[in-house]
Amino acid sequence: MELFWSIVFTVLLSFSCRGSDWESDSNFISAAGPLTTDLLLSLQYPQGNQTSDFAAGGKDLYVCSQPLPAFLPEYFSSLRASEITHYKVFLSWAQLLPAGHSGDPDGNAVRCYRQLLEALRAAQLQPMVVLHHQHLPASSALRSAVFADLFAEYATFAFHAFGDLVGVWLTFSDLEAAIRELPQPESRASRLQLLTEAHRKAYEIYHQKYAAQGGKVSVVLQAEEISELLLESSTSALAKDSIDFLSLDLSYECQSEMSLPEKLSKLQTIEPKVKVFIFTLRLQDCPSSRKSPASLLFSFIEAINKDQVLTLGFDVNAFLNCSSTSKKSISCFLTDSLALQTDHERAARNSAPVSTYQRVWEMFAHQPRAERDAFLQDTFPQGFLWGVSTGAFNVEGGWAEGGRGPSVWDQFGHLKAAQGQATPEVASDSYYKWASDVALLRGLRAQVYKFSISWSRIFPMGRGSSPSPQGVAYYNKLIDSLLDSHIEPMATLFHWDLPQALQDEGGWQNESVVDAFVDYAAFCFSAFGNRVKLWVTFHEPWVMSYAGYGTGQHAPGISDPGIASFQVAHLVLKAHARTWHHYNSHHRPQQQGRVGIVLNSDWAEPLSPERPEDLAASERFLHFMLGWFAHPIFVDGDYPATMKAQIQQRNEQCPSPVAQLPEFTDTEKQLLKGSADFLGLSHYTSRLISKAPEDSCIPSYDTIGGFSQHTDPAWPQTSSPWIRVVPWGIRRLLQFVSLEYTKGKVPIYLAGNGMPIGESENLLSDSLRVDYFNQYINEVLKAIKEDSVDVRSYIARSLMDGFEGPAGYSQRFGLYHVNFNESSKPRTPRKSAFLLTSIIEKNGFLTKAVKQPLPPNSAHLPSKTRASALPSEVPSKAKVVWEKFSNQTKFERDLFYHGTFRDDFLWGVSSSAYQIEGAWDADGKGPSIWDNFTHTPGNGVTDNSTGDIACDSYNQLDADLNVLRALKVKAYRFSLSWSRIFPTGTNSSINSHGVDYYNRLIDGLLASDIFPMVTLFHWDLPQALQDIGGWENPSLIDLFDSYADYCFQTFGDRVKFWITFNEPTYYSWWSYGSGTFPPNVNDPGWAPYRISHALIKAHARVYHTYDEKYRQSQNGVISLSLVAQWAEPKSPDVLRDVEAADRKMQFTLGWYAHPIFKTGDYPDAMKWKVGNRSELQHLATSRLPSFTEEEKSYIRGTADVFCLNTYSSKIVQHKTPALNPPSYEDDQELAEEEDTSWPTTAMNRAASFGMRRLLNWIKEEYGDIPIYITENGVGLTNPRLEDIDRIFYYKTYINEALKAYRLDGVNLRGYFAWSLMDNFEWLQGYTIKFGLYHVDFENVNRPRTARISASYYTELITNNGMPLPSEDEFVYGQFPEGFVWSTSTAAFQIEGAWRADGKGLGIWDTFTHTRLKIENDDIADVACDSYHKISEDVVALQNLAVTHYRFSISWSRILPDGTTNYINEAGLNYYVRLIDALLAANIKPQVTMYHFDLPQALQDVGGWENETIVQRFKEYADVLFQRLGDKVKFWITLNEPFVVAYHGYGTGLYAPGIYFRPGTAPYIVGHNLIKAHAEAWHLYNDVYRASQGGVISITISSDWAEPRDPSNQEDVEAAKRYVQFMGGWFAHPIFKNGDYNEVMKTQIRERSLAAGLNESRLPEFTESEKRRINGTYDFFGFNHYTTVLAYNFNYPSIMSTVDADRGVASIVDRSWPGSGSYWLKMTPFGFRRILNWIKEEYNNPPIYVTENGVSHRGDSYLNDTTRIYYLRSYINEALKAVQQDKVDLRGYTVWTLMDNFEWYTGFSDKFGLHFVNYSDPSLPRIPRESAKFYASIVRCNGFPDPAEGPHPCLLQPEDTDPTMSPVSQEEVQFLGLSLGSTEAETALYVLFSLMLLGVCGLAFLSYALCKSSKQRKKLSQQELSPVSSF
């Protein structure tokens, strides 16, 4: 046969070569190809010895995907051996240039086609490349007007990318198909003209720019269309002008009467003569008896070559056959007969076509088990996406947060339909833990995260034009965080959780839901599509249709398999199609995303393969499960024929229809067909399928489908009854999907695969799941590599455990275990998480990890520096630090500073080898001194623990890398175990296993983009070296140098930051001085100095080794980590204490730093003290060794950077200790203590201010050297995950470091938290926890779980510090015109005259005269004596320029016994005179009727617990309205009823001091207070309002509450309860509905019943009372001072108090500035938030802030900067609430006008804008600076913008001197100077003016800079401003 074809080609060549000038192709062209999916399938999975059909027409073209099928080279070689010269390759424009233009090519596609072309060239086949066959890019840019230009751009791209491999180019292979693809409004002729122009441009570009490549260009034409094309000049270019040869698509019917010469006659009309190539040859009806291939070809040649038309070659596919008997043998040949290729015989052969399912099943049916289960060691294609998934209702929780509406799954949970009556209300709490979830993803190294959007979180009712802002914000934060972590978001629009509101309308059985879904999707595309590029419309719609509406097992629980199930699917498909088309039309052009659908399917194997009916049932099963949705979308727009036929048959067999399958209209079919950019596939398990045993007419999924489902008992079982482990099923399913649906045109995204474990199983060691993932993922790899299936992703289910529908929380799918019993819902990685990470890192299954290239020096390390040889001083020059900082006020010291660190700041965490590694004797490691010590009984370790296992980091490397990535750290500081590398301590015993561990750790860090910082020695000396004397043996210096040299040589190519010793100060003292650490040498006077001497020399030796041998090639830095506590002098003004503090610094930090960073020698302070004390001890020489001059020179400058470990501070004073016995500690001659006000920790008190001072001291002492804080952290004894104290520690300490950097110019380069995780903390064992991650030491796997501090630290890293949040930025502006400015007081607190003029006793009179009730036994008998000082008070008010004055009336001064039996006219007259004086001063009165001071006579009959008081209060109010109402237009009934009820009758802190009925009395009192208010309001409203025209309301008080942990839903709920119990207790009945809020009613009722009561302790209002109470307000009076951090606290049920009912405990943030009151922290942000809460909760009522202020304690504090800060900040937040949030705020009142009697604290807490000098009998009111500041705000009505120039309101009038007795001039500390108050006042004015000028200048400069560049970089180190933080 080969001889036959050789003769034929020889003859053909003689025809073709006559006159040929195509020298490069002088041989006859015989062309095969292109590749099709069917061809690849037949070659790969031969069935018997059958030959493959190579006709290309009608086949699905192969879309290039990597890797190329492995058998292609053999196939190509076989073609070349069969005389084939060329092979057709069809490029995909849409694949190469998805956007249509060359600006963003698909690199993977380019590489793939190049590999294909190179494979052809390697087989000596010439590629014949077609630029476009079908499928234009999906881009709006492909408009008619620019099509030709875009095609030319594409052609240019192809010529450039592939031209070196291609000699023959064809622009179009099917003009008709291309015409149909162009925009339809154009006529066919104009579209053909467009194609002609596109071809012409491509032709010209090739010959102008790429002619040197020597190729030819043409276009494929239908032979019958030649004449038509030649007639039109506009298209003739296609046939003769713009082609190098004519390429024809030729069909020939052998039986046709028309001869070839007639058919090709038009070829002769083309001038000049062109060469002809038959690109496609189709033979029809050519029986073998008629013609041989040779005769047929000769007749073609004769017809074409007539009149010198030259034939170049033919398409020989018609004559080509290949056979393949096994995968290893492919044979292609040209047949000598046409019989094999005749249509007639082909039709006969295929009379019973084999279905896709049957073909796929037959591919694998006879596969031996060993071959089936063989593990493939290979990698996935480049660009393959790895990820994990979740669903909204599975993990989010927050079911009612942010206005979210309920979904069908919420309803399902509330009906207690899930196992264990579980609900998804909290689930995994991802709504609040999105940042933690993204951290988990980083830990996994996930590249894509598939999550779903909760429809009802966006649109609570399913519809509407107003989406929930909170819901949108949640997804924005999640998406932005994913992208910031380089994780691709894949957003699912619908994951089974239909809004319940839509379900109430019929759900997916109501056609209108389609419109609602499209609207919802359209919003999501608009809101998130600029960042989300992968969209899933529906996730597993089969599950919802089958289980939600078929079996009823899922929400919404409808059981109607015959009708509802099919209705739902029908509407889902229509919703999907419309959504896809909406995206395609409206969003794709701009967003360039992809929209698909995720379908789930099991694989189906016939139960009895020998039974055809089982085979048919298996295929039917797939069509019912997968084809139900896939066939309409990916095939023809309609349901599978098999499915339709089966349902029809079943309905015909039954007396009534069993199922109703809706029909699509033709329009709907067109809409559905092709409506997906990818097919997402979920797969979990496989089934054995048989034909249903009998035809049942009872509708069910199986009976309708006619099949029965089974499993093989041999298949491993999981905890889920429906999932068996059948890995090979996924490969078969992927092959089926590829051939049946995607056909190489649409990529497959594997979007769901996983298995659960049960609650009773090992929740962390999920070995079965590890095997599951390993095997299933490997089968996916086989599908890609061996079956050429185009799979683009693997997405595991699930990221973490969640709510699993009917199974509740019993089925755990998570790679991360979630502890649902903990309120914080902590996540802990399972073994399967580490497996998946390993696969991701290797991109598959490699036996060895890929060697990573060396990373760039990402840490931006400083260059080598040299120390200065400055002489020492005693005390050192660093004493300026104490001078600068020690006299700061607490407010100045602790005020929080906002800013960021340098851009290359190195954020990291630390650990050390012995503390975490474990494996103490594994793999040849030698023992260390700590191994020996901990194994010795009585060693002093607290819990008798050892580091034998510790965190097991030696065996848990994957776990450590996981948490490091999750933290987002840039660097990891760890130490090497000397005895793990050199077991005996010397280089004669190198342990390769230990070296390998550190290599893997370092490589893993670098692969995770984490910079390694390596410590050579962290206290764990090899025991073998200790046995020869340890560091007291001089040879240790050489041995340490040898060890370091080996480390530099082995790891230095990747490690660029080395630390020789960690904390040598502590090591030398604890190990050789106190003897508490090994080697336990107790020699306090001598050994520490000797050891330190050796360590310093050892360090210097190693430094020089690195400097001389490695620095030039490795380019790293080297130093040592020194430790120090800040020393604060007890009396900063006492020189001896300052010297003692400096001495402590020199004896600890300077001991090592001074020789290394300064002079090469010890500090003079040390030499002096130790030398003198040695002499006094009668020693011949100093106990402190000395260095030779040579050693000093060698030591000096042996560190490139300064590494500092610091944890705490000490207060130091001079002390003269005993001389003997000698001791390093006594040599320092000082005493240490800690301030008891500093927060406690497990080891030392926290004193964050010391951080800034210590950094400044280093700068002053050692110069501007780069500093790295290599350890800082806090130990806690409580192992809980909610380590809020650790957050406070880091927050305050790092803020002080930030101040040092930004304000003081300290050259700070990095910060490392101690520690990454809990570990062995030396003598404390495992009792103290320093870790950001909790380690469970009781669990053999030592799982690591993130604490909330880990999330906080990640946030710091993300923000690179503590930038000022945009919402906290100061705003300029003015309040609305008419805004009320006021100040307030209360009668009892200021009036005095407690028994004057007939005043009756009040409860506070009684209370203050009772011992132990008031601080300092203060009484208010005189107070401020305002009863006698009306004029002084009015002057004070005028100082403030206020428009209003809020004061209260003393009930017992008007009605001495509380009743109207007697009205005290003298008392009433006081208020008349006061009001008249106010009005005369143009100040309007705001009168509070009741401010805590109940007449004692009423208290004697029960007070507010007696319901008669309601009437008494109404009568009292009536007197006030009658007598004062003509002058008072602003009334407040009650002030802070919460305080009256809670503190007066609950805690007993306030009068009347009742505390023994805390669970009932406060509620009774509150009940009566509300009714009394309502009665007073109605009285005024009904009787007086018309004539007096005033307003009346109540003043409510409330703190704002923030959740302690904002990521914990329990804490969020607790914060809400806190506010509802405080502010809502009284506001809700009055401002909302006349009744208590539901939170209170529910809480109190449930706790009352739990305590055994029959009813709630909270009284109930009758319906008439509710109506009377509701709406009894004209405004919302509001008092606010501070904010708390709230968290859930479960009190015992027997405890009946308001606090217990509330179920909340509260703390405060340590960084919040304090005040004179323990309960009041300055939190201005909370003011704005609670004003917004009032707006939202009570429909934006008019609000008057009736109290707001801050206290101090101590002296007069005239220059009260603290109060100015408070007022400025709080009032500015109020301005934001008005301007930005549209809160209806009408007025602001500062508390208080003047210092007064502050209830149970007496006169200790001072809130006044005026100082009242109680030591002066005249009680003068002296204005503080805050009074003047407040007056300026009042006059300016806010904060005028300085950028607009000086405002007239800032021009202050002359001060009015108040009437007062002479006061002595007091001294004021101002900016470190002692000034008189007058001078300080003048200085403050000057400073204030300068500040205003500075602010104006700064504003102008900021505007100019912002205008010039929006992207201005942060200040460099040289640009930092040393301004104060205040």
Swiss-Prot record:
Reactions accelerated catalytically: lactose + H2O = beta-D-galactose + D-glucose; phlorizin + H2O = phloretin + beta-D-glucose; D-cellobiose + H2O = beta-D-glucose + D-glucose; quercetin 4'-O-beta-D-glucoside + H2O = quercetin + beta-D-glucose
First and last residue of the signal peptide: 1-19
Membrane topology classification: Single-pass type I membrane protein
Region named Glycosyl hydrolase-1 2: 360-853
Q: What is its EC number?
A: 3.2.1.108, 3.2.1.62
| Domain-level remarks | The glycosyl hydrolase-1 3/region III carries the phlorizin hydrolase/glycosylceramidase activities. The initial assignment of the activities to different regions was revised by the authors using alternative approaches.
Protein name (database record): Lactase/phlorizin hydrolase
Biological source species: Oryctolagus cuniculus (Rabbit)
The lineage, from the top, is:
Eukaryota, Metazoa, Chordata, Craniata, Vertebrata
The encoding gene is LCT
